[in-house]
């Protein structure tokens, strides 16, 4: 599958390496692609990356994601599955940019013809692509209004090492708020543990 990843930071690079290892055709999208040729991964401009992609991944800072996607244009994104892994936070990481909503909802509202699925934002880049390295099974969440888009996303999560038994569909795109709002607790837990390589495991009573 042709996967375009918007962004060239740790998350975008980790996901690109993970999906490339699983046999997918990956391309990173940058506003300044000529300055990002040292990544060991193919890099192109944002519009070229969007045109390349069967699946587009938003791995840009949540504060700029919607404007960046608007620069590509709704016609170029129409009908393309967009997996959103971003979270909007203040510069000091103490406040959410969308406290009464979510980045995923903002993207879906701005691009109604683009199915959006939220996932992978409750963990760091290392954990996203190496769940088997954790001390036990954990949970990855999916939010979105389009059932087929979530099924495709689930298959791509499986390719990163997340079995179906670890994937939990928590509802429509409004449920992305729960995923994104975990970011503040994630920061607190990371400070307490002295490590960012952890994630959530949903457990139930027998």
Q: For the regions a protein language model found, what residue spans apply to each?
A:
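NAD(P)+-binding Rossmann beta1-loop-alpha1 motif at the extreme N-terminus of oxidoreductases
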Residues: 1-42, 199
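Generic secondary-structure signature for well-ordered alpha-helical cores
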Residues: 21-24, 55, 112, 158-163
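Short beta->alpha connector loops
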Residues: 61-64, 122-124, 146-147
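Active-site-lining helix/loop region of Rossmann-like oxidoreductase modules
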Residues: 138-206
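Rossmann-fold NAD(P)-binding glycine/threonine-rich loop
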Residues: 78, 86-133
């Amino acid at each position: 599958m042709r996967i375009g990843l918007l962004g060239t930071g740790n998350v975008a690079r980790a996901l690109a390496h993970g999906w490339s290892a699983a046999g997918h055709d990956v391309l990173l999208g940058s506003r300044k692609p000529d300055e990002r040729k040292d990544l060991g991964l193919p890099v192109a401009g944002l519009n070229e990356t969007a045109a390349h992609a069967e699946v587009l991944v938003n791995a840009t800072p949540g504060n700029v994601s919607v404007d960046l996607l608007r620069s590509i244009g709704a016609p170029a994104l129409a009908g393309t599955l967009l997996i959103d892994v971003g979270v909007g936070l203040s510069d000091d990481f103490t406040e959410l940019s969308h406290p009464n909503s979510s980045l995923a909802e903002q993207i879906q509202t701005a691009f109604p013809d683009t199915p959006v699925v939220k996932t992978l934002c409750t963990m760091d880049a290392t954990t996203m692509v190496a769940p088997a390295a954790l001390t036990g099974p954990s949970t990855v969440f999916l939010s979105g209004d389009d059932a087929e888009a979530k099924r495709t996303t689930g298959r791509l999560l499986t390719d990163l090492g997340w079995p179906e038994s670890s994937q939990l569909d928590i509802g429509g795109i409004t449920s992305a708020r729960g995923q994104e709002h975990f970011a503040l607790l994630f920061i607190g837990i990371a400070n307490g543990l002295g490590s960012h390589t952890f994630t959530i495991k949903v457990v139930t009573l027998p």
